[in-house]
Each structure stands twice: as structure tokens, then as C-alpha cells.
């Protein structure tokens, strides 16, 4: 009878630990930890459940509750306070826009599996088209990503063409193909710039990506005018809701690690 009771207690602790571990993984995903792995198809829920279940039957199980409490508190602080806008400020670079530059560069921000631009990509493109309409540059460079899903190569090429056609821009648009990182965008555009004699670029990207992106383009030899795009639901404004602030925190977390990575590789100063 005692053995059965002990086994029941162990099973209960294991199940509780697995549940708490899974919830920790879910909350960590909301905070943006998952995207740091750069493997969107890799879910951490099962490993977290296994680790939580294993810890749940040991004397270390209080650590699960401590971790859960810290993550929960962090979620609440980020969602309901202006912490993220304060953290984001050092990552944002906004230069004065001159009367003329050699080209406008709109950087990519990913696309969906059904080959449509993500909202952030669309916002960047619209901001770039607005600058082109003002006559800031004689040409608009637009990054175009290409990825493999289920063994098939896909891109948001058709969606990009549809939106630019709707804009009816009189400025020539040049698509820069097969970019994967900010670094490859800068290198590919630099190759094109050498042939065309472009030296000064207005780089249009998301606010929190702006400082790293513009530093990357400067590192390959461009003179850069940094232009943060106008983003919907950016989470950086005083009236932002909890969902937007959490989304902004994910961007901040990613950019913080990405900036450190670029510095260590010598791609930016």
C-alpha cells in the first residue's frame, strides 16, 4: 500500500513538473526565446516537458516553480509597462533625410509559407515607396528572399510585384534576389552599386533593426541615410497594447543577440 502511494506521488510530481515545464516553454516562446534558435520548425515544448517531468520527481522541483515565477513576472512587466520602448531606444537610428541620395534600399523581413510578405516586410516596402514618390532617389532597391519549404524553393516575388504595381511608382524598382541575412543584402547591393556608381543609400528597415542594418551597410563601404519604417502595431508607442509590447520585446531580444553576433564576426563596429 505504501509503495502504491509513493508511486502515485512520484507520478503526480512528474506530471506536475511536465506541465510546469511546458508552460515555461510556452511563455519563453511568447518572449522570443524560440526565434534565437533560427529554427522555426524546432519546438521546445516536448523537451521542456521531459526536463520538467524529470525535475518534478527530484528535490530540484522547486527550481521549476522559481523559473515559472520569474518568466511569468517578466511577461507581466513587459506586457503592461513601457519597458520595451525604453530598451529599444538604443537600437533605433534615425538620420536626417537629405534632398537626394543615389538609391533607396528596402530590406526584407521574411515571408509566409504561402509566399506572401509578412506585415513587417510590407510596412518596410510601403515606407520605401513613399520615399520614392517624394523623388528622393532615381532607383528603389528591394530585397527579395528565397527559401526552401518541403523541398520546394519559394519566395514572395509575386506579392512584391503586385504591391509595387498597385503603388504605380514612377521610380524604377530593382529586386535584389536571394538574400538571407542583412549582411548578404549589403554585399549584394554593394556589388550592384559598383556597376552603377551608387555611393549613398537611404536604408529603409524596421526601427529596432535600423542601427545594426545601417552599420552593416556602412561596413561594406556605403554612405548611409538610416530611415526607420513606419510599422503597424510596433509596440513602441505609449498607447500600445500588451500583445504589441510582447511582439516588440521579441524584436528587441532578437536584435540584441544579432547585434552582438555581428560585432563578434567583425561585420559591424
Language-model-derived ranges and their functions:
Residues 35, 132-135, 266:
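Short glycine-centered helix-capping/turn motifs at secondary-structure transition points
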Residues 1-7:
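Short, Lys/Arg-rich, polar N-terminal cytosolic tail immediately upstream
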Residues 245-269:
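A transmembrane-helix-recognition feature enriched in membrane-embedded lipid enzymes
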Residues 33, 90, 263-267:
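Transmembrane helix-loop junctions in multipass membrane proteins, especially transporters and channels
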Residues 41, 77-246:
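A structural signal for short, hydrophobic/glycine-enriched beta-strand patches
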Residues 41-48, 63, 67-68, 87-91:
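Aromatic-rich membrane-interfacial microdomains
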Residues 9-57:
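Membrane-embedded alpha-helical segments of integral membrane proteins
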Residues 62-85:
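Internal/C-terminal transmembrane anchor helices
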Amino acid at each position: 500500500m505504501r509503495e502504491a502511494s509513493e508511486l502515485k506521488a512520484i507520478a503526480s510530481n512528474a506530471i506536475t513538473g511536465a506541465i510546469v515545464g511546458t508552460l515555461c516553454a510556452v511563455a519563453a516562446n511568447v518572449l522570443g526565446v524560440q526565434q534565437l534558435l533560427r529554427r522555426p520548425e524546432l519546438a521546445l515544448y516536448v523537451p521542456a516537458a521531459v526536463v520538467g517531468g524529470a525535475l518534478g520527481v527530484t528535490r530540484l522541483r522547486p527550481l521549476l516553480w522559481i523559473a515559472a515565477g520569474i518568466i511569468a513576472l517578466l511577461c507581466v512587466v513587459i506586457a503592461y509597462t513601457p519597458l520595451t520602448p525604453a530598451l529599444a531606444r538604443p537600437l533605433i537610428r534615425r538620420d536626417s533625410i537629405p534632398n537626394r541620395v543615389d538609391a533607396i534600399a528596402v530590406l526584407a523581413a521574411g515571408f509566409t509559407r504561402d509566399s506572401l510578405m509578412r506585415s513587417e516586410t510590407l510596412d518596410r516596402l510601403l515606407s520605401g515607396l513613399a520615399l520614392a514618390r517624394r523623388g528622393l532617389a532615381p532607383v528603389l532597391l528591394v530585397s527579395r528572399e528565397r527559401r526552401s519549404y518541403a523541398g520546394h524553393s519559394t519566395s514572395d516575388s509575386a506579392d512584391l510585384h503586385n504591391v509595387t504595381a498597385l503603388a504605380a511608382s514612377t521610380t524604377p524598382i530593382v529586386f535584389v534576389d536571394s538574400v538571407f541575412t542583412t549582411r548578404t543584402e549589403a554585399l549584394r547591393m554593394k556589388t550592384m552599386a559598383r556597376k552603377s556608381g551608387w555611393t549613398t543609400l537611404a536604408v529603409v528597415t524596421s526601427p529596432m533593426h535600423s542601427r545594426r542594418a545601417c552599420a552593416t551597410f556602412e561596413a561594406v563601404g556605403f554612405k548611409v541615410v538610416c530611415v526607420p519604417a513606419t510599422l503597424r502595431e510596433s509596440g513602441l508607442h505609449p498607447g500600445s497594447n500588451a500583445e504589441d509590447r510582447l511582439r516588440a520585446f521579441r524584436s528587441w531580444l532578437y536584435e540584441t543577440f544579432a547585434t552582438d553576433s555581428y560585432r563578434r564576426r567583425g561585420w559591424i563596429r
